């Protein structure tokens, strides 16, 4: 990757330094925010290479990266570690402050059917992007109704509903209030003209206190 050389010891050292400080990786040394969504899928925050090695020993075969930043140190190290360990790395970028477009939702559904399990799915904090994807996994792969799947977006996983990241919760709540009473499945709603990500986000209003926490203190992506 441009700017990061993982082929030499010195290059990896420099990449680790960038990862440690620029990606706030020091906060994740002893905290993985790991939770099994099912016996075949675990959600976590951004894993260190040595943590990926530990996960492989536990049977993980696929690593799903939900972050962007493909030129970042975290990505260089994750790619290096997965190649070294023989893990399949899959990139599926999703955001924490936007209503996912139809193609993202349906793409997630298809992703969960084609990957090899057991799998690990992560974003940076393991709270928001991992949360919405866990909701979609629980609904599409496990067959849970949206009401139950929504448990994956909660403070238990450090997700803060009252901030800008609450737009994720709001998206599912709109389905439950607007479409479910009409008998529409979640997929039918997403594929209908009523599913308008721009309008849904415009209708959403973030709470001031939650916004201060997620934007100012936690500095979520």
Model-flagged regions — what are they?
Residues 1-119, 132-221:
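Cys-dependent protein tyrosine phosphatase-like superfamily
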């Amino acid at each position: 990757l441009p700017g990061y050389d993982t082929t030499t010891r010195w290059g990896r050292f420099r990449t680790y330094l960038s990862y440690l400080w620029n990606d706030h990786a020091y906060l994740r040394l002893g905290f993985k925010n790991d939770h099994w969504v099912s016996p075949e899928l675990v959600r976590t925050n951004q894993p260190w290479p040595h943590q990926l090695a530990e996960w492989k020993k536990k049977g993980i075969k696929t690593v799903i990266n939900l972050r962007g930043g493909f030129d970042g140190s975290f990505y260089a190290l994750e790619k290096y570690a997965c190649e070294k360990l023989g893990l399949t790395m899959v990139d599926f970028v999703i955001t924490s402050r936007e209503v996912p477009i139809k193609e993202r939702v349906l793409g997630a559904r298809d992703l969960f059917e084609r990957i090899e399990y057991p799998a690990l799915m992560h974003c940076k904090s393991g709270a928001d992007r991992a949360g919405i994807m866990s909701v979609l996994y629980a609904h599409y792969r496990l067959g849970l109704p949206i009401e139950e799947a929504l448990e994956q977006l909660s403070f238990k996983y450090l997700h803060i509903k009252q901030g800008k990241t609450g737009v994720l919760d709001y998206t599912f709540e709109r389905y439950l209030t607007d479409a479910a009473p009409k008998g529409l499945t979640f997929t039918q709603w997403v594929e209908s003209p009523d599913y308008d990500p721009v309008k849904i986000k415009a209708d959403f209003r973030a709470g001031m206190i939650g916004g201060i926490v997620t934007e100012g203190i936690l500095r979520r992506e």
